[in-house]
Amino acid sequence: MRYCVFDIETNDLYQDVSKLHCLVYYSFDTENDTVASGVLVDYDAIKNFLETQERIGVPLVGHNIIRYDIPVLEKLLGVKWNGKVVDTLAIS
């Protein structure tokens, strides 16, 4: 199983957010027993990362990502996330 746990840091709440400082991720592949991690600050690199995760079908995992992180990424990067999501707020 593959999944990607991530978090973002921004300058404000959704309605006033104008800056994405970084996206931090840990990507796990339990079948191959591998872990990758990184901190992305460049908007193009973040867009490419998200497009890759969606294309290969890796679920994004995080806390409150349905109501904050993903909408902020869509707003600031002009992307639409259509991939799988696991929101730990919803399951807590």
Describe the predicted segments one by one.
Residues Q15-C22:
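Short, flexible loop/turn motifs enriched in small residues
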Residues R2-V5, C22-S92:
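Conserved DEDDh/DEDDy metal-dependent 3′-5′ exonuclease domain
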Residues I8-Q15, I66:
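Short acidic, Gly/Ser-rich segments with clustered Asp/Glu that frequently serve as metal-coordination loops
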